[in-house]
Structure formats: structure tokens, C-alpha cells
């Protein structure tokens, strides 16, 4: 098919997706997690050290905030949210950040941050919030087990993720808002653990967040883009990062069928441009196996093993199916 016809078809597809999302969004948002009230969290000082006393104090402060949010959710009549928050407040769980408002913002630590030589920060994509947090938690725990001793994983839900079917999922708006917070968070981790190797693992729309933050990520060694619809950048050089950029996609991931183009409208651009696993993008490709969109950190999967190898600073095994 001639290039101009193919591009025209991609533009029509994006416009159709935007119209469909605009119609569906009011329906899908009717029982939004953001509707559950929560108290304003107590201010926290920037993390400057990862010694046991500092971290224990931080974990205790966020636990108090979680319990307060749970009580407010119970008074609101949301028993499911209240129960979930009681579970998050258990002493065995450790949060560097917590804000229960507007769907939730959290940063949960898996592993011992005081001794971590490798730190992986998971940046999730669409439809991740306090009511659907279990998947991010399970993925983080699986990666921590795969990495073994000397590693910590942080599940960073530091922004309001878009709904999968919504206009916000087709633009960089939410990512632009999230990027400064991600930059500050990685800077704090580096200050607290200056010798640790930090990697960002960016799933789906999370890869757009990582891309928008990339120029300011001074302390990050690796950016891993997986299940990515694109980044909003035309290639790796446009990310303006010193980090090594990796990209992988499972063979059963539906995101492969997303139009990899960007359509500029008068007041907004929709779509995220070139496919990060394409050779022309310039990322280092890794074999992400045969899984689907939510399977990358599934225990025993090739994608989990290769992502863990990248976090550890070693080369992934196998040959990318998109090379």
C-alpha cells in the first residue's frame, strides 16, 4: 500500500478511536475510584537517606495516612476500598508515599531498600488505581523474587492514570503532568542510595510517562519500555537521556495493532508516534516472549527473566522477535 494511503488510514483510525473514547468515557467514569474521599496526607520531607531509622519513620507516617484513608472510605460506605486499605496498612508492607485522593498515589517498596544495590521502579499504565492495585503489586512481588538478594522494587503509582478507553489515553497530557514527580522520586532514591543502579520499567502508557521524564532522569541507568503504544518521541535520540533504552513486546500483546503514528490537531496531538520495538526507533530490543499485554512480569515468563537481567545490568537472553 502506498505510504500516503497507509498514513491516511492510520489518521482515520486514530480519529475514530478518539471519538469512541469520548463517547465511552462518561459511562466508564460513572463509578470512578476518584469518587471515594480521602484525607489530605501529612507532608513528608524529601528522602535523603535509606538507613533503617529514616525508612521506618517514613513507613510509619505513610501507614498512618493509609489507616486514616481507610476510615474515611468506611464512613463513605465503600467497604471494598476500606478493606483494601486495611491490607495496605499491615506492618509487613512499606510505602514511601501515599495519598488516597483522586484514585490514589502510592510508592510501595518490595525488598530491603537499606541494602539494595539494584532498584527497579515500576511505572504502570492505564486503569491502575487503588481499586485495581493488586496487579501492580503482584508484578512487583514477582520481579523482586526473580531479582533475588540485593535488589528492591518500587511500585510507583505517582500519577492519575488514564482509563484505557478515554481521550486521555490517546494524548501525552497525563504523562506531562506525571513526569516531574517521577523525576523527583528517582532523584530522591539516588540521594538515599547513591551507589545503587536504578532502572525504570515502563508498562503501556507508563512508557509515555517515562519518555516525558527522560531528559531529567540523571540517576537512571536503564529505561525499559514494554507493551508500549509509543512514547511521543520519534526515536531514542529525541528522549534526550543518558539511560540505555530497551524495548520489548510479547507476541500476543494487542498493543501491536495500535496505529503507530501521531496526529496533530489544532489544540492537541493524539497518538504516540513510532513503535519503540521497530529498528528505526533505536532502542535495544529484548525478547519479551509470547505473552499478552499484562503478562510481562508473570512468574516463569521469558519477559520477566529478561527484564530482571536488564535491571541487574546483564544482557537479556534470546533474540527479539521484532529485531
Set out the residue ranges of the language-model regions.
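Mixed-charge, polar/low-complexity N-terminal
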Residues: 95, 204-205, 220, 227
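Short, hydrophobic alpha-helix immediately C-terminal to the catalytic nucleophile
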Residues: 211-215
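Lipolytic serine-hydrolase domain surface
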Residues: 31-35, 113, 126-129, 134-141, ...
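Intrinsically disordered, low-complexity regions enriched in small/polar residues
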Residues: 61, 97-100, 207, 288, ...
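Structural motif
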Residues: 118-120, 197-199, 222
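Flexible, membrane-associating and regulatory peripheral segments of lipid-active enzymes
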Residues: 1-135, 310-323
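Gly/Ala-rich beta-loop-alpha elbow adjacent to hydrolase catalytic centers
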Residues: 201-210
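Short hydrophobic segments within beta-strands
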Residues: 122-123, 201, 248
Amino acid at each position: 500500500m502506498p505510504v500516503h494511503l497507509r498514513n491516511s488510514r492510520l489518521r482515520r483510525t486514530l480519529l475514530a478511536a478518539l471519538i469512541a473514547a469520548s463517547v465511552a468515557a462518561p459511562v466508564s467514569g460513572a463509578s470512578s475510584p476518584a469518587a471515594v474521599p480521602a484525607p489530605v496526607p501529612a507532608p513528608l520531607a524529601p528522602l535523603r537517606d535509606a538507613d533503617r531509622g529514616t525508612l521506618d519513620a517514613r513507613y510509619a507516617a505513610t501507614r498512618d495516612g493509609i489507616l486514616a484513608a481507610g476510615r474515611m472510605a468506611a464512613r463513605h460506605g465503600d467497604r471494598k476500598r476500606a478493606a483494601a486499605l486495611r491490607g495496605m496498612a499491615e506492618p509487613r508492607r512499606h510505602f514511601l508515599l501515599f495519598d488516597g485522593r483522586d484514585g490514589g498515589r502510592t510508592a510501595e517498596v518490595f525488598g530491603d531498600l537499606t541494602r539494595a544495590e539494584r532498584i527497579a521502579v515500576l511505572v504502570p499504565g492505564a486503569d491502575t488505581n487503588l481499586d485495581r492495585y493488586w496487579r501492580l503489586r503482584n508484578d512487583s512481588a514477582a520481579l523482586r523474587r526473580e531479582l533475588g538478594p540485593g535488589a528492591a522494587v518500587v511500585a510507583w503509582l505517582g500519577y492519575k492514570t488514564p482509563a484505557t478507553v478515554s481521550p486521555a489515553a490517546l494524548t501525552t497530557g497525563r504523562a506531562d503532568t506525571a513526569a516531574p514527580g517521577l523525576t523527583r522520586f528517582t532523584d530522591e532514591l539516588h540521594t538515599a542510595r547513591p551507589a545503587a543502579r536504578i532502572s525504570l520499567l515502563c508498562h503501556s502508557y507508563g512508557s509515555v510517562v517515562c519518555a516525558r521524564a527522560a531528559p531529567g532522569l540523571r540517576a537512571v541507568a536503564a529505561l525499559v519500555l514494554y507493551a508500549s503504544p509509543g512514547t511521543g518521541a520519534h526515536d531514542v535520540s529525541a528522549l534526550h537521556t543518558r539511560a540505555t533504552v530497551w524495548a520489548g513486546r510479547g507476541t500476543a500483546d494487542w498493543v501491536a495493532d495500535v496505529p503507530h503514528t501521531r496526529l496533530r490537531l489544532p489544540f492537541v496531538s493524539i497518538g504516540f508516534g513510532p513503535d519503540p520495538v521497530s529498528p528505526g526507533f533505536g532502542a535495544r530490543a529484548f525478547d519479551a516472549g509470547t505473552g499478552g499485554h499484562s503478562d510481562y512480569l508473570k512468574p516463569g515468563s521469558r519477559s520477566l527473566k529478561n527484564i530482571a537481567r536488564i535491571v541487574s545490568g546483564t544482557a537479556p537472553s534470546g533474540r527479539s522477535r521484532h529485531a
